Amino acid sequence: MKRKVMPSITTEKAERQFIQFRVSLWNNEHEIKLNFPQEWKLIECRMAGHDFPSLSDLQIHEAFEKPIGTPRIRDIARGKKKVVILFDDLARPTPAYKIIPFVLRELGEAGIEPDRIKLVCAYGCHRPLVRQEMIKKLGKEIVENYLVFNHNVYEHHVKLGTTSRGTPVLINREVAGCDLKIGVGCIIPHFTTGYGGGAKIMVPGAAAMETIAYNHIEIEKAYPEHVGLGKVKNNPRRVDLEEAAKIAGLDLVVNVVVNHRKEILGLFVGDFVEQHRKGVAFANKVYGTENRGKFDLMVLNAFPIEESPEKALWPAEESLKRGGDVVLIWQTTDGILPHYLVGTFGSDYGGRKWQRPGTLRIPNAKNLFIYAEDFSKLEKRWWGPEDRVFLYRNWEKLIDTLWPVHGKGTRVAVYPYATLQCPIFPDGY
């Protein structure tokens, strides 16, 4: 009889050990069940908030009734002529289709008609969305009844000023022309600004390449020790983009903290700094994942940020024994996200922050094994040297390859949604 796999507990005396993995965000999202040798000492490392309850519609409504640091949306909106709602793209798990109807209801209470409301996909340096993707993100009713635009990182901007650190603030022309600017996004771990969310929906979301590049490259270069995963307090990149968002006139942000099923665990409405910090404090309690020591082998699921799968590798840097191996579960049909700042666009060149491929993306690992249905030669090169990156479509063959090296007693960590997880950070980090 199969035994249930409990979180962070070694499973013994089972014919096979099974763990469920969620895969393919936004594209036929589903769960797959993978098996592991019973002889392995398997530990599933779940985030602290794995079983936190999701918010009801009433609780979501209450968050809109009591914003943080600002009046209600309906009160801010009274007398405004043009409204823009910024939303993030499919590289983020924000259930905008769930949140934006509450925003529209507030605007309706202020007497704002639909033809005075526009929505802009604030994807920064990512790619635009096609209609079906907009429907996935926003819902069919919104796409059919409101004007929805993609941002353009290279054209149609208005220069509104310069931050004290020298970042030129060039903002999407459609956004700049509105007298009420509302952002909708999510607060999830981020490798340079500490956490996503807050002002990031405006910068980089709706900013020009000149703005984004300066904030990403020059600010980061000047203060490298102050940026990083989970670092929000006094983070120069975040402080700079918050100043830029203020110059751009961002009025209010709605941020969610979600679980691995895109269910809303926390919702924070209001001033893009104040609500963000409260959201980060809650996100730390949700996404923080206990360090269970050192491991011979680590299995990391790239879900839900599968288009940026390198974000799943942080547990290996923290807990993999030197010379150990990493298995990446990467079940997405879209592959690596096209990114105009860091992406590859030729045989030996790319965006302004592009790095030449070469060393393995996990310095302390011996090999990287990727479980993927589809992949390209370019993606394989992106991960590192060909003799250290191995791609498998068949899970059983992958396990058979690992077994001669990782036999009985191998200590194995499994992170079921690694791109959503992060270390446990102290308060005010």
Question: What is the meaning of each model-derived region?
Answer:
Residues 224-305:
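Membrane-embedded hairpin module used as a gating/binding unit in multi-pass transport
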Residues 277-343:
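Long, well-ordered mid-to-C-terminal structural blocks that present hydrophobic/aromatic surfaces
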Residues 2-64:
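N-terminal amphipathic/basic leader segments beginning at the initiator methionine
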Residues 82-93, 118-124, 298-301:
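Short glycine-rich or small-residue beta-strand-to-loop segments that form or flank ligand, phosphate
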Residues 9-11, 108, 314-429:
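C-terminal non-catalytic interaction/assembly regions of soluble proteins
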Residues 92-112, 312-320, 326:
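Histidine-anchored nucleotide/phosphate-binding helix
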Residues 68-84, 109-114, 289-295, 320-321, ...:
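Glycine-rich phosphate/diphosphate-binding loops that line cofactor/substrate pockets in enzymes
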Residues 129-196:
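An acidic, phosphate/nucleotide-engaging active-site surface
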